[in-house]
From Swiss-Prot:
Family: Belongs to the OMP decarboxylase family. Type 1 subfamily.
Name of the gene this protein is made from: pyrF
Database matches in SMART domains: OMPdecase (SM00934)
Descriptive protein name: Orotidine 5'-phosphate decarboxylase
Subunit structure: Homodimer.
Active site as annotated: K65 (proton donor)
Gene Ontology biological process terms in this record: 'de novo' pyrimidine nucleobase biosynthetic process; 'de novo' UMP biosynthetic process
Length: 236
């Protein structure tokens, strides 16, 4: 059974602006999910949206995938920490110096620091896509390489597909957090995610948190959809 005080579902607020995002949030239960704010929504609506969601009781995963020189990226994750988000991410391909700088910058926040997660291989990318940018290894092998770099840099975990989860748990240890997008109940459309898995299967594979978007946000009754998936998740 899952810890009910640590919701495993992260609902992706993939909306173009604040009003529909808040309207959806008002239909959800912060005891059963956290919320992910990504690039489009944050660029348009900014920190005020994050604060509005936090005022409704939600923990926020700020999904901006920072990737820049160490000083710039570490300043960005510090700004996220000042905003009080629960989780923030960077691109592992930014390298060890960048990731270490981010981790060190967050140490001053103590127990209030957000989880610092790295992005490995985007779930929309196939082996052919990786080959197109000069990476000859498979997506799975490249994820493992970047996950090892992430752990060696002292970060909390990685974003990865559920298919890589068993291997990453074996390689990196049970405390290394795995955040998995591409989660779809069997009845949902595959969308643009190439590597997908059901919530139950993902948790059993080793995923710690599940990012779920359209199956909840575009459901006729988002709360009912959330509660259905939540019931499935807590039973694992």
């Amino acid at each position: 059974m899952q810890n009910l005080n640590d919701p495993k579902i992260i609902v992706a607020l993939d909306f173009p602006s604040q009003n529909p995002a808040l309207a959806l949030a008002d239909q959800l239960d912060p005891a059963k999910c956290r919320l992910k704010v990504g690039k489009e929504l944050f660029t348009r609506s900014g920190p005020d949206l994050v604060k509005a969601l936090q005022s409704r009781g939600f923990d926020i995963f700020l999904d901006l995938k920072f990737h820049d020189i160490p000083n710039t990226t570490s300043a960005a994750v510090a700004a996220a920490a000042e905003l009080g988000v629960w989780m923030v991410n960077v691109h592992a391909s930014g390298g060890e110096k960048m990731m270490v700088a981010c981790r060190e910058r967050l140490e001053s926040f103590g127990n209030d620091r957000p989880l610092l997660i790295a992005v490995t291989v985007l779930t929309s990318m196939s082996d052919e896509d990786l080959a197109g940018i000069g990476i000859a290894s498979s997506a799975e092998a490249h994820v493992s390489r970047l996950a090892t770099l992430t752990k060696n840099s002292g970060l909390d975990g990685v974003v990865c597909s559920a298919q890589e989860a068993p291997r990453l748990k074996a390689e990196q240890g049970s405390d290394f957090q795995l955040i998995t997008p591409g989660i779809r109940p069997l009845t949902a459309d595959k969308g643009d995610q190439q590597r997908i898995m059901t919530p139950t299967d993902a948790l059993k594979a080793g995923s710690d948190y599940l990012v779920i978007g359209r199956p909840i946000t575009q459901a006729p009754d988002p709360l009912a959809a959330l509660e259905s998936i939540h019931a499935e998740v807590v039973a694992v």
